[in-house]
């Protein structure tokens, strides 16, 4: 692997770890601040329900019951420059367990596309799915 690609992959892995820690802490404990992690025109698909734009996404999260996520797996890949208009972007895939208030523990998987905006990582696209047992 050439040194430039290796540096991109290592940066991607660090970013995925840092971003997902912040993201799930926000979803579980500071949901009123979740909008700051999304671009203004971001898209969310949450177990078949959709929201477009930061304001709609913030409203959607406010309607969800309280939660506690435990992350079990994390994978991330840099997205090639040509696919995202030469903008730095990463594909982050996470899975684990979640307990929503008054519900049983369930498995979930989530896929993000994130990009850098003013030195902050922001969600471009977010797809969250509960796993049926």
UniProtKB/Swiss-Prot annotation:
It holds the Pfam family NTF2. The keyword RNA-binding does not apply. Keywords: mRNA transport, Nucleus, Protein transport, Transport. Signal peptide: none annotated. The keyword Transport applies. It comes from the Eukaryota. This is NTF2-related export protein. It comes from Drosophila melanogaster. The lineage of its organism: Eukaryota, Metazoa, Ecdysozoa, Arthropoda, Hexapoda.
